[in-house]
Amino acid sequence: MRVAFVGLGSMGAPQARLIARNGHELAVCDAVPAACDALRAIARVASSPADAAKGAEVACVCVRDDEQVIEVVLGGAGLVESLAPGALVLIHSTIGIDTLYRLQAALKSRGIALVDAPVSRTRRTDDEAFVFTMLGGESGDVDQARAVVGAFSTDLDHMGPLGAGMAAKIANNLVTWTHLVIGAQATLLAAHYGVP
């Protein structure tokens, strides 16, 4: 499958590497050009998201926040400039569900499908799948996504319609951060009363 991948940070770079190693034809792009250097041997380095998306069947987005996702997908040099009807966009970033709906409206008018596919780290090596991926979208689109997402996922689940994957990820984050805060408060309480 022809795949574009935008965003080669600490999560995106290993995801992209595993996509290429699983036999997909990969084009990559990052706002920091040096981030692409490690993938030059296995991927085409693109000058923009639009360049990366030329001929792509699936485009993956793994950038920092809602604003960056919108720019990568819908901006002047965004994915929509090159993706053809029938293509699929996967959002791996953790963003607001309202932002997903905004993207869906813009992409649907162009015949491009959208699946939210946020990831949660499980384990990490350079050669093995290392994340749990939560998918939200229509069943046919999710089935298409599995062919790519399976390259880097230890587990992947279809959580429901568009937004359900993101809701599951945000809920997971809430539980994780709540446990961290409770743990810190419990430690302070114990220390205050002299518990070693």
In which residue ranges do the predicted regions lie?
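Rossmann-fold dinucleotide-binding core
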Residues: 94-177
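Residue-level signature of catalytic and energy-coupling elements of molecular machines
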Residues: 4, 90, 145
